[in-house]
C-alpha cells in the first residue's frame, strides 16, 4: 500500500507501518487507526479498500506529513534564525540548541574536529 508517497510494508501491523511516514509517530498512528475504525494489530495486507481510503482521508485532512512536514520544520528554524533569537543563533552556528555542554562532546552537531594551530596543553611544573 502506498501512502503519502511512501510504500508501507505489507507484512507489518498497521500501527507500525504508519510510522514509516515522516510526521506520523506511534501515538498519531494509533489515533488515525482509532478514527478510521481499524484494529491496530491488523496487517497492511489485510486492509480492505474502504479502510485504506479512510486512513488516507484522515491523514490528508488532519496531518502534515512527508515533504510538507519537512518544509514546515525548515521554515520554523529559518524563522528563529531570522528573528535573531538565541535558538536561531545556535542553529546558525551549528551548535547544540537545547542547552547541552559544548566544551567536550557535541560532536554530532559540530561535525568533525578542526585542529587549532598553536594550541598546546600546559605541561606539569
Swiss-Prot record:
Keyword flag Ribonucleoprotein: yes
InterPro entries assigned: Rbsml_uS13_C, Ribosomal_uS13, Ribosomal_uS13-like_H2TH, Ribosomal_uS13_bac-type, Ribosomal_uS13_CS
Protein keywords: Ribonucleoprotein, Ribosomal protein, RNA-binding, rRNA-binding, tRNA-binding
Listed Gene3D superfamilies: 1.10.8.50, 30s ribosomal protein s13, domain 2
PROSITE patterns given in the database record: RIBOSOMAL_S13_1, RIBOSOMAL_S13_2
Region: Disordered, residue numbers: 93-125
Gene Ontology terms describing biological process: translation
Cellular component annotations (GO), alphabetically ordered: cytosol; small ribosomal subunit
Lipid biosynthesis in keyword set: no
Gene Ontology molecular function: rRNA binding; structural constituent of ribosome; tRNA binding
PANTHER family, per the entry: 30S RIBOSOMAL PROTEIN S13/40S RIBOSOMAL PROTEIN S18, SMALL RIBOSOMAL SUBUNIT PROTEIN US13M
NCBIfam families the record matches: uS13_bact
Described function: Located at the top of the head of the 30S subunit, it contacts several helices of the 16S rRNA. In the 70S ribosome it contacts the 23S rRNA (bridge B1a) and protein L5 of the 50S subunit (bridge B1b), connecting the 2 subunits; these bridges are implicated in subunit movement. Contacts the tRNAs in the A and P-sites.
Family of this protein: Belongs to the universal ribosomal protein uS13 family.
Subunit details: Part of the 30S ribosomal subunit. Forms a loose heterodimer with protein S19. Forms two bridges to the 50S subunit in the 70S ribosome.
Protein name: Small ribosomal subunit protein uS13
Organism of provenance: Chlorobaculum tepidum (strain ATCC 49652 / DSM 12025 / NBRC 103806 / TLS) (Chlorobium tepidum)
Amino acid at each position: 500500500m502506498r501512502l503519502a508517497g511512501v510504500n508501507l510494508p505489507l507484512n507489518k501491523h498497521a500501527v507500525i507501518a504508519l510510522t514509516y511516514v515522516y510526521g506520523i509517530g506511534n501515538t498519531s498512528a494509533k489515533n488515525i487507526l482509532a478514527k478510521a475504525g481499524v484494529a491496530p494489530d491488523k496487517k497492511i495486507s489485510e486492509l480492505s479498500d474502504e479502510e485504506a481510503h479512510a486512513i488516507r482521508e484522515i491523514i490528508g485532512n488532519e496531518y502534515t506529513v512527508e515533504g510538507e512536514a519537512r518544509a514546515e520544520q525548515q521554515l520554523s528554524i529559518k524563522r528563529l534564525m531570522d528573528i535573531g533569537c538565541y535558538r536561531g543563533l545556535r542553529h546558525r552556528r551549528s551548535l547544540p540548541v537545547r542547552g547541552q555542554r559544548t566544551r567536550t562532546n557535541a560532536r554530532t552537531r559540530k561535525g568533525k574536529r578542526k585542529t587549532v594551530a598553536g594550541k598546546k596543553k600546559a605541561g606539569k611544573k
